[in-house]
Amino acid sequence: MAHMKTRLVYASILMMGALCLYFSMDSFRELPFVFKKSHGKFLQIPDIDCKQKPPFLVLLVTSSHKQLAARMAIRKTWGRETSVQGQQVRTFFLLGTSDSTEEMDATTLESEQHRDIIQKDFKDAYFNLTLKTMMGMEWVYHFCPQTAYVMKTDSDMFVNVGYLTELLLKKNKTTRFFTGYIKPHDFPIRQKFNKWFVSKFEYPWDRYPPFCSGTGYVFSSDVAIQVYNVSESVPFIKLEDVFVGLCLAKLKIRPEELHTKQTFFPGGLRFSVCRFQKIVACHFMKPQDLLTYWQALENSKEQDCPAV
């Protein structure tokens, strides 16, 4: 038994040493998979002057060219919220480029009409979500560091902007803050045909550092700036939530809970008015369902619900 305990202690020391070595490395620029901050240029930027009117919360929504219906549903629901509890809120969509000239032209027209699209010249694809997310961080870094908070989410999400704003005001933590649905002990998937496969060459360790589900996470604006600055010194991984988690680990920023009860639902949630009044984000939302649920919530603002 004593021999077994000794082996476990040695194994733990070796693992901690490996992790310390990994996160203390200054640069991974010799590896083929490294994010380049200076790569690409902005094709579309939204109509906002953060210096003159700093927002309290900016929501960055990853989307694709074909998801126009989802963007329109968001614009008619939680994305139309611009003033919540006296705080300015703005929602923008993150896109890459398409091989289709028609789609690119349509997106340009959409951007001119709504002035809410952020776009750079990289191919819009699922496995470029890390590039898309880092584009959002870069935009905050260059154009809107004055915002207090940022939320990164997806186009198939319900977001309760009002409740999120309420919780952020109560939390009142405006530096080194990162929250969402926390995954503290996830491990890399090594099966090659799995959608989330990560090779040992990309990431040789058996566990990821704590990160938040990419369906929706919220952070203070200084974190966006710090993540952007440190991003070139972290191995590039196509799983954007894991990549951001690696950046957080490098920065020694640990994700924390926003509320004592669960408020982020990456696995979805059955709709009810009272339940959705007290959540922040819910996944697997079809455009028509989002419109229906939002109208139900709007119609029931005076409804008495049990305290949460």
Curated annotation (Swiss-Prot):
InterPro entries: Glyco_trans_31, Nucleotide-diphossugar_trans. The chain crosses the membrane at residues 8-25. One of its GO terms (biological process) is lipid metabolic process. It is found in: Golgi apparatus membrane. Pathway: Protein modification; protein glycosylation. One of its GO terms (cellular component) is Golgi membrane. The keyword Transmembrane applies. It is an enzyme of class 2 (transferase). It comes from the Eukaryota. It is a single-pass type II membrane protein. Expressed in brain and kidney. Catalyzes the transfer of Gal to GlcNAc-based acceptors with a preference for the core3 O-linked glycan GlcNAc(beta1,3)GalNAc structure. Can use glycolipid LC3Cer as an efficient acceptor. Also catalyzes the transfer of Gal to the terminal GalNAc unit of the globoside GB4, thereby synthesizing the glycolipid GB5, also known as the stage-specific embryonic antigen-3 (SSEA-3). Belongs to the glycosyltransferase 31 family. This is Beta-1,3-galactosyltransferase 5. The gene is B3galt5.
